[in-house]
Amino acid sequence: MNKKFKYKKSLLAAILSATLLAGCDGGGSGSSSDTPPVDSGTGSLPEVKPDPTPNPEPTPEPTPDPEPTPEPIPDPEPTPEPEPEPVPTKTGYLTLGGSQRVTGATCNGESSDGFTFKPGEDVTCVAGNTTIATFNTQSEAARSLRAVEKVSFSLEDAQELAGSDDKKSNAVSLVTSSNSCPANTEQVCLTFSSVIESKRFDSLYKQIDLAPEEFKKLVNEEVENNAATDKAPSTHTSPVVPVTTPGTKPDLNASFVSANAEQFYQYQPTEIILSEGRLVDSQGYGVAGVNYYTNSGRGVTGENGEFSFSWGETISFGIDTFELGSVRGNKSTIALTELGDEVRGANIDQLIHRYSTTGQNNTRVVPDDVRKVFAEYPNVINEIINLSLSNGATLGEGEQVVNLPNEFIEQFNTGQAKEIDTAICAKTDGCNEARWFSLTTRNVNDGQIQGVINKLWGVDTNYKSVSKFHVFHDSTNFYGSTGNARGQAVVNISNAAFPILMARNDKNYWLAFGEKRAWDKNELAYITEAPSLVEPENVTRDTATFNLPFISLGQVGEGKLMVIGNPHYNSILRCPNGYSWNGGVNKDGQCTLNSDPDDMKNFMENVLRYLSDDKWKPDAKASMTVGTNLDTVYFKRHGQVTGNSAAFDFHPDFAGISVEHLSSYGDLDPQEMPLLILNGFEYVTQVGNDPYAIPLRADTSKPKLTQQDVTDLIAYLNKGGSVLIMENVMSNLKEESASGFVRLLDAAGLSMALNKSVVNNDPQGYPNRVRQQRATGIWVYERYPAVDGALPYTIDSKTGEVKWKYQVENKPDDKPKLEVASWLEDVDGKQETRYAFIDEADHKTEDSLKAAKEKIFAAFPGLKECTNPAYHYEVNCLEYRPGTGVPVTGGMYVPQYTQLSLNADTAKAMVQAADLGTNIQRLYQHELYFRTNGRKGERLSSVDLERLYQNMSVWLWNDTSYRYEEGKNDELGFKTFTEFLNCYANDAYAGGTKCSADLKKSLVDNNMIYGDGSSKAGMMNPSYPLNYMEKPLTRLMLGRSWWDLNIKVDVEKYPGAVSEEGQNVTETISLYSNPTKWFAGNMQSTGLWAPAQKEVTIKSNANVPVTVTVALADDLTGREKHEVALNRPPRVTKTYSLDASGTVKFKVPYGGLIYIKGNSSTNESASFTFTGVVKAPFYKDGAWKNDLNSPAPLGELESDAFVYTTPKKNLNASNYTGGLEQFANDLDTFASSMNDFYGRDSEDGKHRMFTYKNLPGHKHRFTNDVQISIGDAHSGYPVMNSSFSPNSTTLPTTPLNDWLIWHEVGHNAAETPLTVPGATEVANNVLALYMQDRYLGKMNRVADDITVAPEYLEESNNQAWARGGAGDRLLMYAQLKEWAEKNFDIKKWYPDGTPLPEFYSEREGMKGWNLFQLMHRKARGDEVSNDKFGGKNYCAESNGNAADTLMLCASWVAQTDLSEFFKKWNPGANAYQLPGASEMSFEGGVSQSAYNTLASLDLPKPEQGPETINQVTEHKMSAE
């Protein structure tokens, strides 16, 4: 990157003096974020309490004892003493908040992320050329701190910032905004890619004494929008700083250890932060085709869901601009469900399942068609598809299910979500049904559960051995491939039940214990190439994590109920060695296949023996009668079919078992009939035309068990009988017809309402998926793409140590992602991707295989075959990976079945995943440790904390009513677990426990809940700002409070308490829904507030159903930067369906503004009557509808084109001389200008405006909140902004001089042809440049950098796009506009007599935009003068390469051959680097076929092309 900028150095003085100190063009984004109060953990703070083991100090002076007394005080100077460490050297770390490390700066001349210092000497830290912090370290000389070697210094405690909160706030704001690894949560990277960036930082740091709002505007425009590209769905940075308890030390030897101290030890190869991750769905199957963004780069998840990230950094996942969610990269397997809170996470999982196809090994593949549809709704897609809606049984509540209406799925039946859904389903041959969740963690001692599992798995040598457990796949048929593995979740919801089998979901889940890992514990590939000495470690149970169970066992009285989540296991009873694929029975009753191993026969024998209480044993000549309501078993085979059928019976190998068919269950004797094998429902055997329908799933509308049957069965179980159910229940079991089945399972402490499969496919699939396997051997070249022009790691030739660049530079966001190498080939004029992947099954001869290898070697010169035959996951070479032997099916390479490895270690690890009581107690003790400054409790290691926290979030983040049952074994700790719940829920959970007096006192004493003497008695204290790493139990209960209204949260700080009583209000609401684009939607503000925990009723008089939303707020769950400093509940928004002429009643946990969205195709309104609400300030149609002093804490302004939400005091608008009227007019002017930029001037058709007066109720939305999901602001509906100052009387947004609102709304509106690959954070800013030109007279954003653009293009060797960041790439569009200013005449396209649309401009400085406006219109199919210029619209046609379209469109519209310009920029390209190469390589961009096409048009070359432009046009502004 230095090379890229070297030519800029000579211009620094001019650039800096001209612009840096001038602010942001007279005004800025207005983006403001209150930096949360931070408890500093700086090393300069003296230790509060003595080290508990100070004895080494007085005694270690065995040499003369001249003065043994001076020890208490260091002033006798330690030098006379002969100890080896009189003033021990220590290692310091510059941090934010004591825990978030700052890298890229220097302290005392060394890296700020690990520098040496001697206690007593000052520490001086420099970033760029500016001293940003000085610390006095005298306190570290205390003898009590001798053992503490690692010390964190918080920037906030720097001497330069002492005594000024504004300086502290501004310094943190600048540092976080300058962060070059924005997705990382543990580090902030001050690594400047150019001298320009460094000087910009220096200049701004000198201005930190400005008012925070003014300073923030400077930062937003000068720093944030020059961000490096490809770091996140949005490269915006977050100003949130971790909140830590004062006095903590990042040293494990300290008396008070910080929560994330372990990260300060991660320096060896196995501890390196850079990791390989795997994105999986709720069943543990890899999810391919999802965009992911880290500071280490961006990419698309590989064939098995693989991605690269920096350990501990935030990884953001999305599809195009659709933000699925973010998660902290602290484990090897990231489940979709972890990308949000449990509801949101399950919805993400459902969304991906719905819009994905089935790949190899049941992986999910998001096809390009989904991306293309989403791209039509940039950023606004985030509001159209609401990931926060309740989703029936899809709550990700650990092993618990929240039985809510599936509003998430229902949203696809209306509005723009329906339009998107319809478009995707049409392009992908239909959409899948929804599904469900994932679990991690452990801690249970051996006991009954372990013993039973050992028996059933055959670990107990008295039982039959089971080493490979067979998992059947769904009988769907996509591209000839069978469906995903199906082990439907069977969750234990009380201690009466426990799991029998849970499939692994850790990063190396498909590798058995003892095998070499494919990924290290940081989810990185092992770099084993010479001279590295890294050795892959073995897979062990210590690193195993598990999904929810799909086989569980519950107790009812003396009896046992076992449920297995797939009906095909019945076929094993019929043909125990012929069930896996295309089995069956011939006319003689003989099994047609007999080749399957004995494992599943052994398992079934173990099950039959155990459930019959040894009344039947294999090989023992015992007899047993089994009762059943099954007539038929079905064998798995190819196709969307039920499979070959046979009468339900037992194979002769199960000797002595006879079958009796039952239709009722009264008075059954367990001694005579010890076991029943039942189904709860009829099978679905006819799937019609639905390609996603699963044959043999339970038809919950046709129950086979009546309530009387269930009563009889419970009686039978109570007497000691056993019931085995093998069934696939794909329902949340809300149906009345399912109530009997639900009751039966509930009696045993079980639930199948989770409605998801929980078994991962083996890693097979399309060629672009890393770490995959096929049935036969494969050859694959997997690599890490280059970062900033170099490999992302180095190997020390002497030590063999691997060092990852992102770690050395402290840029966790730069963590690379493993990929299968690919290249583009020109095939018939289209660019097609080829992957460095060979399946030996495709090559029948050695010559054919050799030729395939040679093709790869030719594409990647210097590439060699891998050399270690004992390890099959090497990277940076052509690797051979043996096959699995399991046949794969169809074009998606899905295996016929999945196998799970079972052994004693697996059994042990699995049981340890489910101990709720121990887990919650350990998290409580960890929180006590931090709440008492280390005096009480016990700190968990950060690794254990993450595991326990993630596991408990699965169990707690739902509204499942857990219970403890006396007299039953409680190995899962339900007694302790429910006691904690009752302390927070005011003993709402009836059953065997209540909140004990001792636990309640402890919680009250430690400020976790409010005591009886408080005015807030019965509420929990959310302890904002809340860091889950220090207060995990509080965070877990705060998360649960969204679902469980028995947990009442103190809302005084956020969103604000309302003391007034609710009232009855009737409002008339528009129901009309006809948006041009989703980001200018028809959600209607009511001006009413739903108070927290109070019942609200809404009565509708509308003739159409509507959606009611309370509170517009992002979901922060899993957003790591926010999780360490939450200032509000992570999930706030609630959504309800309200039927036509119906009534809805609800309580919301925290309060919020109420919104209503109708879906009427006609322009109509209806009245709604609200009960229990209070009014909120509401300025609409130029007047106060509800006055400013209304009781709600938030208010809104509604103009013709915008709805603006903000704390009510802001609506005083004291910074606007024209008050709210002027502000509303400015918002509308911006909206109108945006219509102009995109060439939209009509009320219908191709060029329909986003908003206009004849489209009532459809408006852009902009909402301010105390914390938002990503960055200072982000796009969507609404656009969200983190400016939240409840005590300010000023509005934080200035619509006609505000880069932030232009940038974010520009995200929403960005359209082809500007949106090429890599332009996510660029194309939107072209609108902002247009606004600067139109209202400020000059493109200030690019005015300086464009002066050196021609030199940059020469330096970049025709790869300027790939080498540049967002700021550099914006120059391409700016050069094109400035060239068009003098070289493009719009009138040529509008012949005489054709009126020129009014949005075109002849004003100086605006004429160049005419080119862009016409390009936009042409891309939408505008036909004006097409016949005059060749008849073919090159803007509206695509060969699949967006960069080709951009070049051809621009050249055709300009009627000029711009090939030289596009060759120098090569938009759409990206860079990578081969192992050992010293130079970058590039791929993608404009194809040769596009240049050929352009040449064939025979357009004139420009005399001076856009590539020569080095200045912007400046227009002296007058009022427009």
Curated annotation (Swiss-Prot):
Lipid-conjugated positions (S-diacylglycerol cysteine): C24
Feature: compositional bias, Polar residues: 97-107
Pro residues bias (residue ranges): 51-77
PROSITE patterns: PEPTIDASE_M60 (PS51723), PROKAR_LIPOPROTEIN (PS51257)
Pfam families: DUF4092, M60-like_N, Peptidase_M60
Membrane-related topology note: Lipid-anchor
Effect after changing Q1511K: In strain: O15:H- / 83/39 /ETEC
GO terms for MF: transmembrane transporter binding
Effect the entry attributes to changing N1358G: In strain: O15:H- / 83/39 /ETEC
InterPro entries: DUF4092, M60-like_N, Pep_M60_3, Peptidase_M60_dom, TCAF
Lipidated residues (N-palmitoyl cysteine): C24
Compositional bias (Low complexity): 31-42, 234-247
Protein name: Putative lipoprotein AcfD homolog
